[in-house]
Amino acid sequence: MKYIGAHVSASGGVEFAPVNAHEIGANAFALFTKNQRQWVSKPLTEDSIRLFKENCEKFGFAPEYILPHDSYLINLGHPEEEGLTKSRAAFLDEMQRCEQLGLKLLNFHPGSHLNKISVEECLDRIAESINLALEKTKGVTAVIENTAGQGSNLGNEFWQLKYIIDRVEDKSRVGVCLDTCHTFTAGYDFLNDYDDVFGEFGEVVGFEYLRGMHLNDSKKELGSRVDRHDSIGKGLIGFAFFEKLMKDPRFDNMPLILETIDETLWPEEIAWLREQTQ
């Protein structure tokens, strides 16, 4: 079964996210558990935690199909100690918020070397950052999102995801989220080589590590390494790819999350994607 949703607003409190997801016809969703543009946020209140859990139960959202996203400020591969320490503390806080909410996944962008350290040194720092957070938490899987490779962002090549996973001590608590826009603009031509691209992912990383996907069309061309999302079917990826993806059983039983640019289209996009599973 396909679990399809979008990255919904948690404005006013995390407890509103499941309500917003239900209203667009979703059976999965993503959210920020805190303000994603601030380093420090107020702790979650007991009321918010209770209401979030109640609303998830009320609208039928299981933790396996909720994919929270961490703050954009965090860089787990930061080349400088101050930035690294700050990022690690913020990431741990995000993991602990997921624990409090009974969530099982935390999606994050791996990190950037900022042209100050080598790719491998940065990847080593990312893996160590994950290990430190996993040691201090229970039950939450760190889900590495592949990137477009914009600027000095890492995670745009499958081998880099594998490199990080290889260095994470608790393999049961690390996973991957594939973003369709990022995969395309990173240079993986799944329009012409669908079987080869996902075959390569299976061989290099392994589908056992795939915990979710972000379903986004792309405003930018294949291999551009520029991250600009578009609405489903309106960008350079197009409808046919998503139709194929929806019929592919390898993507069953995980959150498939829209981060497309026009949220007024989300109910329509979710309904269309669901139709393609028939």
UniProtKB/Swiss-Prot annotation:
Reactions listed under catalytic activity: Endonucleolytic cleavage to 5'-phosphooligonucleotide end-products
Binding site for Zn(2+) 2: 145, 179, 214, 259
InterPro entries in UniProt: AP_endonuc_2 (IPR001719), AP_endonuc_F2_Zn_BS (IPR018246), Xyl_isomerase-like_sf (IPR036237), Xyl_isomerase-like_TIM-brl (IPR013022)
EC number per UniProt: 3.1.21.2
Names of required cofactors: Zn(2+)
GO terms, molecular function: deoxyribonuclease IV (phage-T4-induced) activity; DNA binding; DNA-(apurinic or apyrimidinic site) endonuclease activity; phosphoric diester hydrolase activity; zinc ion binding
Residues bound to Zn(2+) 3: 182, 227, 229
UniProt remark on cofactor binding: Binds 3 Zn(2+) ions.
Keyword field: DNA damage, DNA repair, Endonuclease, Hydrolase, Metal-binding, Nuclease, Zinc
Matching SMART domains: AP2Ec
Annotated residues for binding of Zn(2+) 1: 69, 109, 145
One BP term from GO: base-excision repair
Function: Endonuclease IV plays a role in DNA repair. It cleaves phosphodiester bonds at apurinic or apyrimidinic (AP) sites, generating a 3'-hydroxyl group and a 5'-terminal sugar phosphate.
Record-stated family: Belongs to the AP endonuclease 2 family.
Protein name according to UniProt: Probable endonuclease 4
Taxonomic source organism: Bacteroides fragilis (strain ATCC 25285 / DSM 2151 / CCUG 4856 / JCM 11019 / LMG 10263 / NCTC 9343 / Onslow / VPI 2553 / EN-2)
Gene: nfo
